[in-house]
């Protein structure tokens, strides 16, 4: 397994170009299944999860081409409606083929998902919604099997806000017979980006960006061209890295307006942030102030930024409380941060972070995608050398992170698994 070695103590300066959003790219790739005509995408990040999704689509008979952030999909000859365990186990977002397959082909067989080890993320909301639209669903031998002659429009009220659930039901509804209303829908920008692609393919969707989506089903969708929204979590991660390590960095290809929950807290910590339409400049030359926060659904503070901001808080002046309301078991980075000298205690859904004056490099292990990013941030600040093991987690969600950090002055290098 590859490892990262970080020599801490370097200030960061320069420019970073932010990649397309992982959490938009994955559902958008799956949406290619909804049309027999080609879909052309731009600003697709080069990530392990994207490669896994393309492999999955390829096994179903979708012709895929990808190079330099551009991906073309041709689903005119889909001949396999099964998403196998071997691929789905590595990436939970594979469940997103379920809605498109049932909507366009009338059946699907999708393995129950895997992905990040951060607690139970049940697919029952996906299943209930599809059943409300007339799908017959059985779960046996580790697979979800769904059938429907044609899905029927329905009013769906999800029991909880679910991003992938909203996306799956939205993709199913665009080809259903009649009107579908999704209440308590996720409002994340990545859901809105998927909806924008679907509209450009001929779907009829109202309420994009709100918690109530109204979809008028159409008989078929056509091809389209679409540019994936910038990754707000990647941008937020780099903002926290500069805030923790110190320096002066400009981020390009960002949407500041979808990052406000994070930038508000960074300003509270003493960070200077300037913004334009598609850029942000972050400057920090002092010890951060401790900032408490609570994760919640968009537009509140994102759970996917909790670990990175906690890494910043480890070095802050004062004590902060971090409350995680979305996922249980999402404090696995705490014991690794403590190995670097942090002072964090956990009580249920709350972490109490007592800021320390310095961290010291050590060997640590990444446990999930965002936890690995928090260890990178801590390593940038720690005295001496930090070695992060199991960084395949990082590769699932960050496009060339170490080369982007190196370009702004960090001392980061990758040790290949066969050299470690």
From Swiss-Prot:
InterPro entries: Enolpyruvate_Tfrase_dom (IPR001986), Enolpyruvate_Tfrase_sf (IPR036968), MurA_subfamily (IPR050068), RNA3'P_cycl/enolpyr_Trfase_a/b (IPR013792), UDP_GlcNAc_COvinyl_MurA (IPR005750). Keywords: Cell cycle, Cell division, Cell shape, Cell wall biogenesis/degradation, Cytoplasm, Peptidoglycan synthesis, Pyruvate, Transferase. The active site is at residue 116. It is found in: Cytoplasm. It catalyses: phosphoenolpyruvate + UDP-N-acetyl-alpha-D-glucosamine = UDP-N-acetyl-3-O-(1-carboxyvinyl)-alpha-D-glucosamine + phosphate. The modification 2-(S-cysteinyl)pyruvic acid O-phosphothioketal is found at residue 116. UDP-N-acetyl-alpha-D-glucosamine binds at residues 92, 121-125, 304, 326. The keyword Cell cycle applies. Gene3D superfamilies: Enolpyruvate transferase domain. Its main location: cytoplasm. It comes from the Bacteria. GO terms for biological process: cell division; cell wall organization; peptidoglycan biosynthetic process; regulation of cell shape; UDP-N-acetylgalactosamine biosynthetic process. Its EC number is 2.5.1.7. This is UDP-N-acetylglucosamine 1-carboxyvinyltransferase. It comes from Paraburkholderia phymatum (strain DSM 17167 / CIP 108236 / LMG 21445 / STM815). The gene is murA.
